[in-house]
């Protein structure tokens, strides 16, 4: 029997420069710490060294959401400008 395991790179307080790999057993219901970073730039996969707490940044979904939130107000302003110009 092979147990499915997931390796999670995390940062450690003592070793700021190198990420620490933690082994998580997927068969047990252990909570995996996931942090959605609120950044101004669209976030790429990064393991921030300045944060002492263990964080995992997942880039694909939050990038889309933060990007959509950013573009929406700008698009609304453009629409308003068009209507006022005409």
Swiss-Prot record:
Q: What's the domain of life for this entry?
A: Eukaryota
Gene Ontology cellular component annotations, sorted alphabetically? cytosol; nucleus
Its recorded name reads Uncharacterized protein C794.15
- Species of origin reads Schizosaccharomyces pombe (strain 972 / ATCC 24843)
């Amino acid at each position: 029997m092979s147990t499915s395991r997931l390796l999670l790179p995390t940062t450690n307080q003592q070793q700021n420069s190198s990420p620490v790999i933690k082994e998580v057993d997927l068969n047990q219901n252990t909570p995996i710490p996931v942090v959605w970073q609120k950044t101004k730039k669209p976030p790429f996969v990064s393991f921030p060294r300045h944060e002492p707490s263990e964080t995992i940044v997942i880039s694909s979904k939050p990038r889309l959401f933060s990007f959509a939130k950013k573009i929406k107000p700008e698009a609304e302003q453009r629409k308003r400008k068009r209507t006022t110009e005409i």
